[in-house]
Amino acid sequence: MATIKDVAKMAGVSTTTVSHVINKTRFVAKDTEEAVLSAIKQLNYSPSAVARSLKVNTTKSIGMIVTTSEAPYFAEIIHSVEEHCYRQGYSLFLCNTQNDPEKVKNHLEMLAKKRVDGLLVMCSEYTQDSLDLLSSFSTIPMVVMDWGPNANTDVIDDHSFDGGYLATKHLIECGHKKIGIICGELNKTTARTRYEGFEKAMEEAKLTINPSWVLEGAFEPEDGYECMNRLLTQEELPTALFCCNDVMALGAISALTEKCLRVPEDMSIIGYDDIHASRFYAPPLTTIHQSKLRLGRQAVNILLERITHKDEGVQQYSRIDITPELIIRKSVKSIL
């Protein structure tokens, strides 16, 4: 691997001159600059990123810690973050934690050693222990995005209550009165608020919620599949079902298909998140859209602002508002 000394020797100049050409820190005569650039090209020389970062106090890199990059919703946010980082001249180090506290700690230590310019933390839920751990790395500019009510983090307000209400209202407006729900784990903020939106819409329409049609599971396709199979053991079935995320809806549709039941002819289904794949479900899924692109971009912009002003004291926590929108496709049937 070529060194700066090799470049200087080939160009017939000092290493200091090579450094000035690379970093544009001093005027260098045109012919000298061309000789240096020619030597760099011939030798395929690349300046040491570590050495440069020590000199200019930046690595142009950002660390991102997420619960998982496998879930389509998070994957689409990560894609948006990576793309926006790239356009701003930053590399992204992605770390999956799988909600393992030891992994969180190890990833934070590794990213600190790599001298990342900032940290973006995006997990589905936070414990006090995890928040305390993050605070111990407070010398690094950081954006901790939280869907919950914690006071010591930035907040993503995805208006899940409104989204749950909007989804249920659409089913009601299509004539459905027997409506079930496959919700997430109700001890978690996002699932609970979507369920509360469902409750509100049912209450407004003076419709009774059948407790047997309220099924709880994780935001995974397997849980949607298992919940639907439990629902199908009942004598009376709902005409419509609100699945509180799209991958649960996929699992639910799979279970229906195995029983030779059709969507929406035998049961209407509405999802939530509008992941990219949802338009290719069979049938294409009616769902609630959240802008993952906007969320990723805004989170990066907040972090870059903190990196720029990191020496100016404590930063105020930020809030990102994501407005839910109804996307009508083919999985809900009107029975009016």
Swiss-Prot record:
It comes from the Bacteria. Residues 4-23, 48-56 bind DNA. Pfam families: LacI (PF00356), Peripla_BP_3 (PF13377). Signal peptide: none annotated. Residues 2-56 form the HTH lacI-type domain. Hypoxanthine binds at residues 73, 188, 190, 219, 273. GO terms for molecular function: DNA-binding transcription factor activity; transcription cis-regulatory region binding. Pathway: Purine metabolism; purine nucleotide biosynthesis [regulation]. SMART domains: HTH_LACI. GO terms for biological process: negative regulation of DNA-templated transcription; purine nucleotide biosynthetic process. InterPro entries: HTH_LacI (IPR000843), LacI/GalR-like_sensor (IPR046335), Lambda_DNA-bd_dom_sf (IPR010982), Peripla_BP_I (IPR028082), Tscrpt_reg_HTH_PurR (IPR023588). Keywords: DNA-binding, Purine biosynthesis, Repressor, Transcription, Transcription regulation. Homodimer. NCBIfam families: PRK10703.1. Consists of two structural and functional domains: an N-terminal DNA-binding domain, approximately the first 60 residues, and a larger C-terminal domain, approximately 280 residues, which imparts the function of corepressor binding and oligomerization. PANTHER family: HTH-TYPE TRANSCRIPTIONAL REPRESSOR PURR-RELATED, LACI-RELATED TRANSCRIPTIONAL REPRESSOR. Is the main repressor of the genes involved in the de novo synthesis of purine nucleotides, regulating purB, purC, purEK, purF, purHD, purL, purMN and guaBA expression. PurR is allosterically activated to bind its cognate DNA by binding the purine corepressors, hypoxanthine or guanine, thereby effecting transcription repression. This is HTH-type transcriptional repressor PurR. The gene is purR.
